[in-house]
Structure formats: structure tokens, C-alpha cells
């Protein structure tokens, strides 16, 4: 698991005492990479992009802070794994959920820590799916 990018901008000098609304949008993509060389490993990939926006409750159209982050989780299948078997598993929603369920809490926790570092305490931000 790794952070690919993080970008934040906070226009508020102090968020304490302000009634702030926050919107968060996660986008999750899954992929299966097949090896292009003999003896290579298949890889399952989960890419997560999270964007967020903070605004005063009485002026929701005026962004006070914007946040965006990208994350990647990589899952290596054993070298001896059968390509047809892994591909069939990867098509099943339960297998996809298993991969995302391992990656999303890490991304969400990191995103929340970065928001806290900027003065936004969002205890109700979802950490799981």
C-alpha cells in the first residue's frame, strides 16, 4: 500500500468555532495485471482516489478547503497460481470486496490524519466500506 499523491489547500486561518460542512467522494478502481514475462506474478491492484471539500454551513457553494489524494494497493498472487483461476476469482464481487476491504481503511485513515493536521476533526469520516 502506498500514497501516490496528496494535495490540500486550506483558505481558513482558523477552523475553530466555525460551523463547517464537509463532502468526501471516493472513487475505487480494480485491475488485474497479467505477467508479460515467463515466471512473472499476477498482481491485483486497487486504486483509490479521494476528494474532499469543506465549506461553511451558511455558504455551501464557497469552498474553504479542498483535498485530494490517490492511493494504490498491490496484491501479488503466487507464481504458481493458475491464470484462469485467478481471473475467474477476480470477476467475483466477493473477491473484489476482499481486496478493497483491505485497502480502503488504510486510505481513509491516512486521509483523515491529513485533514486533522490541517485543523479539521472529522470523527464521522467513514473508515470502512
Which residues make up each language-model segment?
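N-terminal intrinsically disordered, cationic/polar leader segments
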Residues: 1-102, 109, 113, 117-129
Amino acid at each position: 500500500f502506498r500514497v501516490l499523491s496528496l494535495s490540500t489547500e486550506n483558505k481558513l486561518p482558523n477552523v475553530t468555532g466555525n460551523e463547517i460542512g464537509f463532502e468526501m467522494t471516493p472513487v475505487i478502481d480494480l485491475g488485474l495485471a497479467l505477467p508479460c514475462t515467463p515466471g512473472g506474478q499476477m498482481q491485483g491492484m486497487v486504486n483509490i482516489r479521494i476528494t474532499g471539500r469543506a465549506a461553511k454551513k451558511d455558504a455551501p457553494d464557497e469552498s474553504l478547503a479542498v483535498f485530494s489524494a490517490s492511493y494504490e494497493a498491490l496484491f501479488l498472487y503466487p507464481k504458481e497460481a493458475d491464470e484462469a483461476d485467478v481471473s475467474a476469482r477476480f470477476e467475483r464481487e466477493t473477491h473484489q470486496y476482499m481486496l478493497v476491504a483491505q485497502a480502503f481503511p488504510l486510505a481513509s485513515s491516512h486521509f483523515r490524519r491529513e485533514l486533522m493536521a490541517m485543523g479539521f476533526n472529522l470523527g464521522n469520516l467513514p473508515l470502512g466500506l
